[in-house]
Amino acid sequence: MYDLANSAFSTTVITAIFPVYFTSVAGADLPPGEATRLLARTTTIALATSAILAPFLGALADYAPIKKRLLGLFMAIGCIAAGCLALVVRGDWFLAAVCFGIGNVGFTASLTFYDSLLPHVAREDEIDRVSTGGYALGYLGGGILLALNVAWILSPATFGLRDAGQASRLSFASVAVWWFLFSIPLFRRVHEPTTRAGRGARSAAELIATSLAGLLHTIRELRRYRHALMLLVAFVIYADGIGTIQRLATSYGAELGINQAALITAILLVQFAGIPFAFLFGILAGRIGAKASIFIGLAVYVALTIGAYYMKTERDFYVLALMVATVQGGTQALSRSLFASMIPKARSSEFFGLFSIFEKFGAIFGPAAFEMASRTTGSSRSAILSVVVFFVAGALMLSFVNVRAGQDAAQS
């Protein structure tokens, strides 16, 4: 149920409504293009903070019996930050940026502890089903609340609201309430798992030092699985491009003059259309292989990013949104499953922990590159082309991955 709960923040705040609101309302008095750059900068800082915290939080999650308490703490931080966004009005760009950044850290950090609970609530033969089921619930939950939020914004008078601005602020408050309420079942029904505390580590500092030593050991071990390591590097690069598109699409569209209703409706289209296409990508991978399918996904991303440079109308934005829906879920899901096939099963948790940390660190560079390119060129339209570099470089690294050799190494 926590996937259902936290997805509201991902869809309404990170992806759909807040970026548009920030550009058109909170940052309306800023110089042209500055709101989009500020949003990219805030995203970079939040992701960097999360990446720095990740190994330390992972240490506590592995060794101390406080997973649920820390999950609750960061969930509460995220909920409060989302609720505070409802206070943001025209010109409050600083308050908006601070709340958005803190909310991002709370959201990401809570997932560290949530993910660590999975092996404790599902048997080994159930983990894939439980994990994908949670992912589907997340799509559903985020889509349902976003649909309601879109209805408020498109027709505020129908719901007794003054205008779209008030409807947007109510949407942020609804995220806080939704996130909190649907988190309750986890805290009521999931027991705090036993930990390795006491096995040679006695203080918080020693626990963290022990975990970081284990992280360095895992990195050294991964070098033995050369093709899995190359896949990890490739994924970190192109996933950064995917994340940048996801996080900055609506603010970019708003800056180019696409109205708020069209932007949010397009994101809603991605949310629901992405579900069947993710399954179709799985079928495609069964026929031509995961690696080839990922290449197709990256080619589509290159095409839609170039298309974003030429985008002028709402119809263009809808077409690009549909292109995202065709590849977003499938590309990321196949990347994870391909990585899983190239690491020893007995050490999957260890290697996926490293996967998660690398992913968080990698996510910093896309928004940072976009902001730098925007400042250099003076145009977000030109800056969007910088994202193509991540897809091309990631695909180039992926081309060196020998899937069969990697799978053989994992089984030896």
Annotate each predicted stretch with a short phrase:
Residues 1-47, 227-266:
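Helix-loop boundary and gating motifs at the non-cytosolic
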Residues 31-35, 151-177, 372-391:
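A membrane-interface helix-boundary motif in multi-pass transporters
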Residues 52-66, 276-290, 374:
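Helix-to-loop junctions at the C-terminal end of transmembrane segments
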Residues 69-84, 292-307:
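Structural signature of the two symmetry-related core transmembrane helices
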Residues 86-99, 309-321:
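Helix-loop junctions at membrane interfaces in 12-TM secondary transporters
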Residues 109-122, 330-344:
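Intracellular juxtamembrane helix-capping segments at the cytosolic ends
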Residues 178-189, 385-412:
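Multi-pass alpha-helical transporter architecture, strongest
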